[in-house]
Structures are given as C-alpha cells and as structure tokens.
C-alpha cells in the first residue's frame, strides 16, 4: 500500500501532561471550569496538561503545565505514551503524557485560573467512582494511571 498525504491525520493541536502519584499511589487531578468554546469540560477531572506552544518541546510543555496548574515543579521520569483525541468541535489533538515526580520539599499550591477550579490527589477508589460517573474527561487518563501504578509498584485500580 502506498502512503501519501491522504493516509495521514492532520493534527490541529498538540498537548502534553503528566501523571503524578503521591506516596499512597493517589493521582493528582485538576478539575476544569471549562473554557470558552468548550463548556462540556466544566466540572470534569483530568491530569495536569495543556497546549504545547509553538517551538516548545512536548516534555517541556508537560513540566510547564504541571507547574502552572498545581504549583509543583516536576521531573519527568518515564514517557507513558501519546494518543489522539477529538474535541466535540472536531479539533484533533495529539497529547503526550509522562510519569513525573515532584521536586522535593514542595506542597500542592494550585493556581486557580479561568480554566482550573481545583487540584487534588485522588485515591484509586475515588478515581474508579469518578470514572464510573463520567467525571474523568478522557478515558486515556485511566489507562495512563493504570500504567503509572504498575510502573511504581502500586496495586491496580479497582474494577
């Protein structure tokens, strides 16, 4: 099969984020307020993440977004993967995700903005309930959380 431009998917937005676990294996999530043009995001939980700026490396963007949304300086330790998603308006997004660790001696200090309402560590059990209730913004968040738990030697998510 020949490949040309018709076989490639045009990505309109690049994003990057981190999965950050505490000493109990709880995941750090941010609750979104929703942004103009995307009211469907309001109240949903997601990993700290955001757009990759022009000329920016996705890993650097993930670190920057984590700090902007949570107040934590983080260090990426493992690339977990990338996935394509589509917003309800049809925009195709490519998101890169890293497992990260916070630099020592910090406390969670989220910078609440017009996009972020809350930031909190969520237990495996509470995550499972949020996911079942449709309160986790993207199903890939569950997959990356499961990968991070395995990587760090924590028990799996409840079924």
From Swiss-Prot:
<comment type="function">
    <text>Hydrolase that can act as a nucleoside triphosphatase and a dinucleoside polyphosphate pyrophosphatase. The best substrates are 8-oxo-dGTP and 8-oxo-GTP. Other substrates include Ap4A, dGTP and GTP. May be involved in protection from damage caused by radiation.</text>
</comment>
<feature type="short sequence motif" description="Nudix box">
    <location>
        <begin position="50"/>
        <end position="71"/>
    </location>
</feature>
<feature type="binding site">
    <location>
        <position position="49"/>
    </location>
    <ligand>
        <name>Mg(2+) 1</name>
    </ligand>
</feature>
<keyword id="KW-0479">Metal-binding</keyword>
<keyword id="KW-0378">Hydrolase</keyword>
<dbReference type="GO" id="GO:0016787">
    <property type="term" value="F:hydrolase activity"/>
</dbReference>
<dbReference type="Pfam" id="PF00293">
    <property type="entry name" value="NUDIX"/>
</dbReference>
<dbReference type="InterPro" id="IPR000086">
    <property type="entry name" value="NUDIX_hydrolase_dom"/>
</dbReference>
<keyword id="KW-0547">Nucleotide-binding</keyword>
<dbReference type="InterPro" id="IPR020476">
    <property type="entry name" value="Nudix_hydrolase"/>
</dbReference>
<dbReference type="InterPro" id="IPR015797">
    <property type="entry name" value="NUDIX_hydrolase-like_dom_sf"/>
</dbReference>
<keyword id="KW-0067">ATP-binding</keyword>
<feature type="binding site">
    <location>
        <position position="95"/>
    </location>
    <ligand>
        <name>Mg(2+) 1</name>
    </ligand>
</feature>
<feature type="domain" description="Nudix hydrolase">
    <location>
        <begin position="11"/>
        <end position="144"/>
    </location>
</feature>
<dbReference type="InterPro" id="IPR048157">
    <property type="entry name" value="Nud_hyd_Dein"/>
</dbReference>
<feature type="binding site">
    <location>
        <begin position="1"/>
        <end position="6"/>
    </location>
    <ligand>
        <name>ATP</name>
    </ligand>
</feature>
<comment type="similarity">
    <text>Belongs to the Nudix hydrolase family.</text>
</comment>
<dbReference type="InterPro" id="IPR020084">
    <property type="entry name" value="NUDIX_hydrolase_CS"/>
</dbReference>
<dbReference type="GO" id="GO:0046872">
    <property type="term" value="F:metal ion binding"/>
</dbReference>
<feature type="binding site">
    <location>
        <position position="14"/>
    </location>
    <ligand>
        <name>Mg(2+) 3</name>
    </ligand>
</feature>
<protein>
    <recommendedName>
        <fullName>Nudix hydrolase DR_1025</fullName>
        <ecNumber>3.6.1.61</ecNumber>
        <ecNumber>3.6.1.69</ecNumber>
    </recommendedName>
</protein>
<dbReference type="GO" id="GO:0005524">
    <property type="term" value="F:ATP binding"/>
</dbReference>
<keyword id="KW-0460">Magnesium</keyword>
<feature type="binding site">
    <location>
        <begin position="50"/>
        <end position="51"/>
    </location>
    <ligand>
        <name>ATP</name>
    </ligand>
</feature>
<feature type="binding site">
    <location>
        <position position="1"/>
    </location>
    <ligand>
        <name>Mg(2+) 1</name>
    </ligand>
</feature>
<feature type="binding site">
    <location>
        <position position="53"/>
    </location>
    <ligand>
        <name>Mg(2+) 2</name>
    </ligand>
</feature>
<comment type="subunit">
    <text>Homodimer.</text>
</comment>
<feature type="binding site">
    <location>
        <position position="65"/>
    </location>
    <ligand>
        <name>Mg(2+) 2</name>
    </ligand>
</feature>
<feature type="binding site">
    <location>
        <begin position="87"/>
        <end position="89"/>
    </location>
    <ligand>
        <name>ATP</name>
    </ligand>
</feature>
